[in-house]
C-alpha cells in the first residue's frame, strides 16, 4: 500500500524538482523517496546534485554522501568531500571521521595523501592501532625512518590487535634502513617469534639476517688472513 502511494507521488515530486531546481526540500524528499522505492542509484544521483548546489550542510548528510561514494567504489571523490568538509568543520573533528578520510585515500591508493588524516586520527586514538597503520602507510612510500618511528610508537602505546605483527614490521623497517640497524632489526624479529601467529615468518627473517652476518664475518676473516699472508715476507724468502 505504501509503495503504491510512493509510486503515485513520484512523478509529481520529480516535476517539482525540475520546476524548482533551487528548492532544497523537494530534492531531499525526492532522494528519500527513491531510497524508499529501492532506487538507490537515483537517490545517490539526487544527493550528488544537492551537494553541487550546496544543499547538503549537515554533518550526517555530508558523511552519508561520502559513504555512498565509497559504497559505489569512487574513493577519490569520497576523500575530496571528507577532506573539504572536515576542514570546513561541517563534518565533525572526530577520530573516526579522520580515519574514514584516510581510508578513502588508501582505497584510492593515494598513500601520501592518507598520511595527514591518519596522523590526526592516530593522535586522537587511545591505542596504538592507528599508529601501526600509519607506519604501514609510510612503508608503502618507502619512508623507512618514519615507518620505524610510528611502528615503534604503536608498540609503546600498546593495546594492539596483533603485537607480533607490529614487531615483525618493526624488524622489516629497521632492516631496510641498512646494515647499522641490522642488530636492532634482529632484536625486533626475535621479539616477534614470541607470538604463535608470527613465529614462522619472524624465524625466517632471523635466519636471513644471521646468515648475512655470518657471511660478512667469514669474508672479514678471509680478508684478514689474506692481508696477514701478504705481510709475511718469510713465505716468499724461505
Question: What is the role of each PLM region?
Answer:
Residues 1-179, 186-238:
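Alpha-solenoid helical repeat scaffolds
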